[in-house]
Structures are given as C-alpha cells and as structure tokens.
Amino acid sequence: MNSFFPSRKLGQNFTVNLSVIKRIFAFVKNLNPQAIVEIGVGKGALTNYLLKLKIPYKGIEIDKRLIEYLLVEKILTEDQLVKGDILKKDFNSFFENLSPLLCGNIPYSITSPIINKFLESKLRSFVLMTQKEFANRLLAKVNSSDYSAFGAFCQYYLTITTVFKIDRHAFKPKPKVDSTLILLEKNKSVSYDFKFGLFLKQCFNQRRKMLINNLKHFFAVDYLLNIIQKQNLKTSIRAQELSPCQLFNLYQNICNGKN
C-alpha cells in the first residue's frame, strides 16, 4: 500500500511504532479475553498480533481501500472482517455466548459515541487508544477544570485505568497531540441508565452556576432545595463539586420523586 493516503475525514492515524504495538498486544494478552473485537483494523499492524491469540476475532473497518487490502493480502477472512460504520453496528451481535474484549485506536470525533454504545451493550471491557486530553477528562477528579458531565457519567459506570501514554511520533500521519491507552471495565454493581447522562448534561450546562440554577427550568426550586438539603449538601453546591455517586443519588431522588 505504498500509494495509500490516510483519510482526514475518517480521522486516520495509524500506529507504526512496533514497540508500542507490542506493548498493546502484551496488555491485551494478559487480560486473557474470550474473543476480540477490533475497531479500525487499518493496515493490520495490531491485528497480526491479536490473531496469534488463536481466539475468535472480528475486525471492523469502514475504509473500502483498507477492506480490499486486508482481504487481498489475506490478513483477514471475509468471516473475520466486519465492513462498515462501527456506530451502526450492534455490539451484542459480534459473538454468541462469548464476552469479547473491545479494542481499538479510535478517532477523537467518535470516541464519546463509541463509549456510549459500549455502555449500552453487554460487553464488559474496552481497551481504547484515544487522545491524551480526552483520557484526562475521563479520569478528571472532582472539582478539577477537566471534570465534566461525560467524565462523571463514565466514572460512575466504569473503572477507568491508564495503561500507558503514547507519543504522537508513534503514529503516521503524526497527530497534533499525544495519546493514552486506557482500559474501561464495567462496574458490575450498577445498572446502566442513559437518562442519567441527560441529567448530568443539564447539571454541568453552565459550570459556574449553582446546581439549582441549572435545574430550575425543569424542577421547582423548593423541590430541589428540599432534596439537596436532605442529602446534607449546601444549597449553593455546583455540579463539579459532587462525586459521580453523589450526582447519581441526586438524579434518583430528583427524577424519581418528580410528580
């Protein structure tokens, strides 16, 4: 593929550093997955290692040029290759009676939607390479400048672990920022509720505003004050001052108690 030009529209930045590829593979191998679903096969740099695990594998690729290359070069079979947009795929349909590990180098523009689809699915673990800044927001501490609605949402449902940081020079074409490999593991003790995410978006809508002011267009102020006080919180509290668990407790009390 000497004449191949990465697509800016698809956000293609291929991992070309062999040391990084081997580190990712070693980490995935240590997780001892039952099966693998790789998002964005690309030219198959990581794929060639993942196939050595000799476990069920599916690779998702949207670029028709790469699909042809992967099949012509016999890197993947028709059965192993899933063609099309990952956001239009049912994550639960890849394997029956198996819980595959999801992994991939994801374009920044679709990282949040993919994580949401992962949360909605039955899959339990996701090894994700993403922009360093995005990873920082996912892992941000309460009351920090990076703490956000989506970060709090993910932290409530997931255990998020930084695996290692990856320099931008490990990719071709070289992106403007460094990347981070993270592991997302679902917390078994909580059930997914997408409406919690909608609630958080409103809570964090204007960070400098008090929580009550961000929610008063949806709930009566007296009603909000009563619930906040029952949670032993100050009435001037802001969303970014609350932990994911505190925010979920407020969500349950505010939304479930609404007449």
UniProtKB/Swiss-Prot annotation:
Its EC number is 2.1.1.182. GO terms for cellular component: cytosol. GO terms for molecular function: 16S rRNA (adenine(1518)-N(6)/adenine(1519)-N(6))-dimethyltransferase activity; RNA binding; rRNA (adenine-N6,N6-)-dimethyltransferase activity. It is an enzyme of class 2 (transferase). It catalyses: adenosine(1518)/adenosine(1519) in 16S rRNA + 4 S-adenosyl-L-methionine = N(6)-dimethyladenosine(1518)/N(6)-dimethyladenosine(1519) in 16S rRNA + 4 S-adenosyl-L-homocysteine + 4 H(+). S-adenosyl-L-methionine binds at residues 13, 15, 40, 61, 85, 105. Keywords: Cytoplasm, Methyltransferase, RNA-binding, rRNA processing, S-adenosyl-L-methionine, Transferase. Belongs to the class I-like SAM-binding methyltransferase superfamily. rRNA adenine N(6)-methyltransferase family. RsmA subfamily. This is Ribosomal RNA small subunit methyltransferase A. It comes from Mycoplasma genitalium (strain ATCC 33530 / DSM 19775 / NCTC 10195 / G37). The lineage of its organism: Bacteria, Bacillati, Mycoplasmatota, Mycoplasmoidales, Mycoplasmoidaceae.
